[in-house]
Regions:
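Polyanion-binding surfaces on beta-sheet-dominated domains and ring/shell assemblies
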Residues: 2-200
């Protein structure tokens, strides 16, 4: 079929896709969407970038588009999507494994209310360095062809940039997402090359 979107097996190079014309047609269609993609992608060029990137990841471009945001003129990806990209495309035997360490009792639910410049209220994490001491997560996965898992430990206190209210609502989840991204940047950086989140 002329307009079928097909990615090559190596998933490494946009130039290896067999139907660029199909991608361009899909991008034009996406750009006309009223509710299924965010407003910052209402143009063919950005939609084409999403289509090409989605093909490389083996994902639905409309789903990927919903997990993007625009910050200071740069297109970013939500942490949930980045974690999914890693689990789907990293050369690992199984999904990333997480082990939380430390006493989180003084961190989870420890929030305070703040007011934005526009007058909107939101909650932020209110834990102190003493509360966060020892709290962290270990993320690990075994690479294909290896028997020993590769690990990375990220402590909550190491995270100084917490740009999302989710750091207050669900700090364990946010730390796990960030640890997964750091693990991938260390052990298989090509999988998320050029992918940035709000924490960066």
């Amino acid at each position: 079929m002329k307009n079928t979107l097909v990615a090559s097996n190596n998933n490494s190079d946009v130039g290896s896709y067999t139907e660029l014309e199909g991608m361009m047609n899909l991008a034009r269609l996406m750009a006309t969407s009223k509710v299924t993609i965010p407003t910052h992608l209402k143009n063919e060029g950005d939609c084409l970038a999403i289509v090409m990137q989605s093909a490389q990841w083996g994902m639905n471009p409309f789903s990927v588009a919903q997990k993007t945001f625009l910050l200071n003129g740069v297109l970013g990806y939500e942490s949930q999507l980045v974690s999914a990209i890693i689990n789907k495309n990293a050369p690992i035997k199984q999904r990333l494994q997480y082990e939380f360490i430390g006493n989180w009792d003084k961190v989870i639910g420890n929030t305070k209310e703040k007011t934005s410049q526009k007058g909107n209220t939101y909650r932020v994490n209110a834990s102190t360095p003493a509360d966060e001491k020892g709290c962290g997560v270990k993320v690990s996965a075994t690479m294909n062809g290896e028997n020993k898992p590769r690990e990375l430990t990220l402590m909550f206190a190491q995270v100084t940039l917490r740009n999302s209210t989710l750091w207050a609502e669900d700090p364990k989840q946010q730390l796990a997402y960030l640890a997964a991204k750091k693990w991938a940047r260390l052990y298989c950086p090509d999988v998320i090359l050029g992918v940035y989140t709000k924490d960066e």
